Amino acid sequence: MMKLNLFINANETESYIDIHAPKMNDHVQSIINAVNDLDKSHTLVGYIDKEIHIINVSDVITFQVINKNVTAITSNQKFKLKLRLYELEKQLPQHFIRISKSEIVNKYYIEKLLLEPNGLIRMYLKDAHYTYSSRRFLKSIKERLSI
């Protein structure tokens, strides 16, 4: 059971969080990730032709580079973004995983994984398509998915 203490002090110049734990474990790490995600962007601006759309980041299945443009793919739309993939990666919550030079996936939309004989991971996503990880990102993917 986790204990929570809140201290309100008008003399404090900024808000901060201290975590006290007997050891680092998955529960503590998930709290750290949740706190870090508070500063991350939860909406993005995307474009379809000349229309401007506000996209909820949690609705995005994957971000892919298509024809040198970063594209946010949801279950029913594809939006062009004006960000580079590396810029986007810094803004996204922890549940987005870089799987290749040209793709970032939302781990909540990963349905299953297939380890290929060549060492790559084939990721089946909930929108009924699949994608491949690159070997360069394999170690990071395994760590982020705890496999």
From Swiss-Prot:
Localization per record: Cytoplasm
PROSITE patterns given in the database record: HTH_LYTTR
Transmembrane stretches, start-end: none
SMART domains: LytTR
Cellular component terms per the entry's GO annotation: cytoplasm
Short name of one Pfam family: LytTR
Listed GO MF terms: DNA binding; phosphorelay response regulator activity
InterPro entries named among the record's database cross-references: LytR-like (IPR046947), LytTR_DNA-bd_dom (IPR007492)
Residue ranges of domain HTH LytTR-type in the record: 44-147
The keyword Nucleotide-binding belongs to this UniProt entry's keyword annotation: no
Keywords, in A-Z order: Cytoplasm, DNA-binding, Transcription, Transcription regulation
Chief place where the protein resides: cytoplasm
Protein name per UniProt: Uncharacterized HTH-type transcriptional regulator SAR2449
Source species: Staphylococcus aureus (strain MRSA252)
